[in-house]
Amino acid sequence: MNLTSLQTFLTILETGSLVRAADKLNVTQSTVTARLKTLEEELGQVLINRQKSGATLTPAGAKLMRYAPAITGLWRQAKNETGLPAGLTSACSFGCERDLWHGAGRAFFHYATSTQPELAMSARQGSGRDLTDWIATGSLDIIVTFDAVARASQTLYPLPAEELILCSDRRNTPIIGDPNYIFVDHGAEYRRVHAEFYHDAGIARLNFDSAWWALQYLLENPGSAYLPRSLAQPYLDKAALFIVPDAPVFHRKKSLLASDQAVEKFHWLEKAIAQIQSHERPQHDRAPSQGQAGQ
């Protein structure tokens, strides 16, 4: 089977059309069409319905989809490991949302690299949607992300919920009524509980969908924002930021998601997860917890 054609098949499904697949693969649409035709001829089945509204799976395509991610993932692993330098026996591709790198992401990466000297590691940043797509297609072995749902041939490991605390560049900032309040979008459940608690606070003038961006802005400008504790803690420790007293502490679910192949292959994975869970135990002694999201 032509692995390039199979990867193209997966990219068509990921993007929803042959045109977008061509853009993502940086090839012409005719090349994408030719690769798909090659795969269909090899299998003797039509795999994708080509429609103006987009590409959809045929029954045969749905059956192939059960195996395609595993096939491409195994090939990628074989390719990576056969090219490893002497002394390295395996490779792990890891992905993490940027807002989680400072806590669970970095803790996992450090554990793997420090305890497994024969392991080659690569790290990749992406949105939650990108990461789940990449692990589904075999491009990644393990991811740390928010609000994950395990698909077939994947195992989900819940991690301690991420604490979201109200931080400010000033002491004694009001909980409600700060004209420089920055709204950070931490997901649908957070938006719901935030709206319940701050129902009479009005609409924030500044909005970010990245806690990292909000942090960088807050370090250079007056204001307040809900940030993940793991991200804000270094700046709290050196008094560059301050926790707003008595503000509710929200929570957001996060998880480590691994392909079943990775679970079987990396015998140290559960120890790494236990290390993260121990390192990120709830810190109720540092701030009151009055509101919750994703619990």
Task: Give the location of each predicted region.
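Acidic, Gly/Pro-rich loop/turn segments at junctions of secondary structure
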Residues: 125-180, 231
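A late-sequence structural motif
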Residues: 244-294
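Alpha-helical linker/hinge and terminal dimerization helices associated
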Residues: 42-43, 64-86
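A short LG(V/I)-centered, amphipathic sequence patch enriched
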Residues: 40-59, 76
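Central regulatory/effector-binding core of bacterial HTH transcription factors
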Residues: 89-151
